[in-house]
């Protein structure tokens, strides 16, 4: 009996050498033993290898261009041409990444597909930013947004271009692999056009200088990103981020570009047989005819334009489109405010005249879809203050006069509603 006890005591894990007494569990196999601690360690190694494998990264099916357009259509009204352009560009971009990550997709000819960043042209409030945000949400990739006017060349007061990459890392919770597949949206890029068509001997640190500084990260480079924001922490360790697979969407209103395009097209259209179109048609469709030479004349440098081969144009939203923006998307503003009031047990009714008047006011202010929320806040703000204290109110009605004349919204009580239904 004592011999059997001694034999049990000498049983050891075949991997770490610990005895049966030193571990919680010792599992026996044909001539081998493994302890619970070694099992846990093996599980951790397998999980880590699986998380880092290319197959894991590309498991998620890439939506087709038609599916991307349909998804955008649920949230963004109009801009059909821009949606199609963006859908194809985004599909090709992430298809290219998947091909690079999966060796079996590489062909024998070793063709390397270049990155195609996107330039979006269109007036304020036409949906440029929202299109980019919706794309990132659909693809479930990190999204960072910055204003080009805040950027300056390195060494000058303002943000370095590396700070854009820091925002992307923050959006990815500092997961470098995830950040390297993200989307960066740079707005107001028309504001960094150089001041003159001809190169200047004076330094343009917030115009042409920023365009020059952006060239490398647009094309694809391994950038050193300061995790604490750069200039105030010179001794920090940098994070290396490869921008080869980061999709850049660069956008701007480009006010005045239509005149540049019109001048070029006007010269081409002189003489007998030339097509004559109205001034309104020219201004409406001008961006559709944009050429690289027009952007150079506007103030973008040729190298910068060359790194933005895909051009998507968006148009001003008219009254009908703005009314649809208010009511149709899945998260439309009217649906959002209806939900807020519904939480207080109140129904929101927007009369057709009110919707048209709100759209007209946004057009008058020149704010487009971006200004719709501010107008609704002006109308509904006082109501949302009163309603929580008014237990008998069941419905709020917004009429055209509430928008055009500042009339107070009609509050319908439960007794009044019963009287009207009777």
Swiss-Prot record:
**One GO CC term, this protein:** HslUV protease complex
Which GO molecular function entries does the Swiss-Prot or TrEMBL record give?
ATP binding; ATP hydrolysis activity; ATP-dependent protein folding chaperone; protein dimerization activity; unfolded protein binding; zinc ion binding
According to its UniProt record, what is one Pfam family this protein matches?
Answer: AAA_2
Q: Where does Zn(2+) bind?
A: 13, 16, 35, 38
Q: Which positions in this protein are listed as binding ATP?
A: 123-130
Q: Which SUPFAM superfamilies match?
A: Glucocorticoid receptor-like (DNA-binding domain), P-loop containing nucleoside triphosphate hydrolases
Question: Carries keyword S-adenosyl-L-methionine?
Answer: no
Oligomeric state and partners?
Answer: Component of the ClpX-ClpP complex. Forms a hexameric ring that, in the presence of ATP, binds to fourteen ClpP subunits assembled into a disk-like structure with a central cavity, resembling the structure of eukaryotic proteasomes.
PANTHER family (UniProt xref): ATP-DEPENDENT CLP PROTEASE ATP-BINDING SUBUNIT CLPX-LIKE, MITOCHONDRIAL, ATP-DEPENDENT CLP PROTEASE ATP-BINDING SUBUNIT CLPX-LIKE, MITOCHONDRIAL-RELATED
Protein known as: ATP-dependent Clp protease ATP-binding subunit ClpX
The primary gene name is clpX
